[in-house]
């Protein structure tokens, strides 16, 4: 009887472990752990030292936006310099792409939330369907010179599409430029950043650097911004 009871307990424990593991795995895949960033940074630094200043990055077209231009190639650093990519890396089924910024002077590891790319892709698809029939995008309002708000009702949306900010968790809107390219509007988050770090930037400078300097994330799919009267504005 005791033996049967022991087997039953072990089975239950195994079942519970099986139930808990996926939840833990999911959490591991979405949280930008500082230790994971540091582990990748250490591996990148070591690779660079061992390979004459060459960085472990994938090749991208020269026209690739700067924050997406230098994705880390984990095949070059695993398993020799780290056992495997972090659990939250896209290569491991996570939601973050690991990239490098400041590659010329101080290569630094940062993150891109790949879910943002998926939402941009969906919006571009609906925009293309609309343009196939009407030729021009459904502009609703001019935000500033060359930057516009879209009329989403004309595109078939019941609600205004937004994307969750990796910085604040707030919902951020989209904008479109005169070329028909879709971007995320980060002004809400930049306003908050200026409240904290406004003395670090001045009018005429691209203030997206505040995101790069003070957070783990790069402002992907963004237009340049500067500051005027202590508020963020689009900058050309």
Language model region names:
Residues 36-52:
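N-terminal alpha-helical signal peptides/signal-anchor transmembrane segments
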Residues 20-23:
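Bacterial signal peptide processing site
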Residues 1-5:
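Positively charged n-region of N-terminal signal peptides that target proteins for export
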Residues 27-34, 38:
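Juxtamembrane membrane-water interface segments immediately C-terminal to a transmembrane helix
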Residues 15-18:
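C-terminal motif of bacterial Sec signal peptides marking the signal peptidase cleavage site
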């Amino acid at each position: 009887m005791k033996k049967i009871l022991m087997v039953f307990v072990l089975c239950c424990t195994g079942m519970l472990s099986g139930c808990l593991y996926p939840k833990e795995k999911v959490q591991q895949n979405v949280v930008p752990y500082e230790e994971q960033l540091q582990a990748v940074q250490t591996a990148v630094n070591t690779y660079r030292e061992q390979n004459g200043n060459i960085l472990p990055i994938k090749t991208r077209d020269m026209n690739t936006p700067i924050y997406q231009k230098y994705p880390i190639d984990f095949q070059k650093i695993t398993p020799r310099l780290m056992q495997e990519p972090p659990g939250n890396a896209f290569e491991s089924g996570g939601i973050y792409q690991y990239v490098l910024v400041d590659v010329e002077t101080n290569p630094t590891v940062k993150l891109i939330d790949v879910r943002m790319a998926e939402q941009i892709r969906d919006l571009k698809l609906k925009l293309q369907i609309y343009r196939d029939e009407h030729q021009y995008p459904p502009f609703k309002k001019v935000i500033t010179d060359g930057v516009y708000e879209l009329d989403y009702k004309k595109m078939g949306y019941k609600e205004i599409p937004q994307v969750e900010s990796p910085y604040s968790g707030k919902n951020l809107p989209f904008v479109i430029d005169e070329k028909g390219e879709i971007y995320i509007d980060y002004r809400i988050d930049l306003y908050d950043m200026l409240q904290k770090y406004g003395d670090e930037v001045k009018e005429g400078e691209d203030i997206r650097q505040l995101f790069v300097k003070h957070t783990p994330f790069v402002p992907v799919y963004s237009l340049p911004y500067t500051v005027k009267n202590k508020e963020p504005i689009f900058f050309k």
